């Protein structure tokens, strides 16, 4: 008797479409809100060095909640977790809209984002199969970057028109994301019945950290993605100061347009990675990571807007090619060991720890009066060296493994 094969689930299923739409509007709100709030604190005459603290409150929420959000994502239906997280984001946006402390409001958005991240990536492994996971990650990253592109531009352009109008549009975006969350079919919890004692949850989380760190592929993903996002968020704030210094432009829109060029490039790079890189060939992405640092140095020395646009598109393409395979690799390794939700929570701890460290250093050197050009050059050189060291470390580890297997 011949066995019947189960029909393949199409990549763009109802569930996937709902997840992608929710992700777009949620990420749109995050990015538009950042630039609208930056314009607000500029209007309120906060010092330049305080700008990174807006993002630092956001990422601190990720770090503090890291031991708990992975278990939350795996203990409940991930669609419901995403809905709850977007509700928190909406509350944070409304707090800023009504004149509340902008740092507190954006930190509340960070709490929502911390809960949202493990669920949004973890759900991909539940609604796709096999090789579709890399393609699904490509769609997720493309949606995210499209949201960064449009959200960043909208935040800056609308803030030049009316800051509180821009903030209100951010709240509307979170409301649309909530509506899309309601279209995600209710899925079974991946790991129900886990204990809810904080000490046990923290112990379980750090156990997951150890398990993933001992896995060579997971370790590569954790280190690579942490370095990338730490550098990426620092570049975003660097552009805010670089534009008036290098280009002589003082509006809110130009830094957001330049950030949008990075987003355009990441869409291209993510698409290329989905076609050219598989889970078995993830290390092909490392040269792109090294070149990111090189391009940052070249970009920092520019004084022409068009060349800046071109270089940032290239920078984004390299970033997309670098990050998408690493994300897919961690989800695959995590799903097989500690659960996709816990794996993404561990990843968030690494990424946001790197962001907090780099933003803190950036704020310090700005306060010390270091030139923004010198900051950009040093930033690019250090990133390229870090990726080069990671690359050499992997080559040496591979040689050791071959020598051990030959004995």
From Swiss-Prot:
What is the topology of this protein in the membrane according to its UniProt annotation? Multi-pass membrane protein
- Where the protein is mainly located, per its record? membrane
User: Where does the sequence pass through the membrane?
Assistant: 18-38, 53-73, 91-111, 139-159, 163-183, 229-249, 257-277, 286-306, 310-330, 343-365, 375-395
A Pfam family name for this chain?
MFS_1
Instruction: Name the domain of life this protein comes from.
Output: Bacteria
Look up keyword Transmembrane helix and say if it applies.
Answer: yes
Q: Which GO terms describe its cellular component?
A: plasma membrane
Which keywords does this chain's UniProt record carry? Cell inner membrane, Cell membrane, Lipid transport, Membrane, Transmembrane, Transmembrane helix, Transport
Q: List the disulfide bonds.
A: none
Q: Where in the cell is it found?
A: Cell inner membrane
The record's InterPro entries line, in alphabetical order, gives: LysoPLipid__transptr_LplT (IPR023727), MFS (IPR011701), MFS_trans_sf (IPR036259)
Q: Which GO terms describe its molecular function?
A: lysophospholipid:sodium symporter activity
According to its UniProt entry, the function of this protein is described as: Catalyzes the facilitated diffusion of 2-acyl-glycero-3-phosphoethanolamine (2-acyl-GPE) into the cell.
* Name of the featured protein: Lysophospholipid transporter LplT
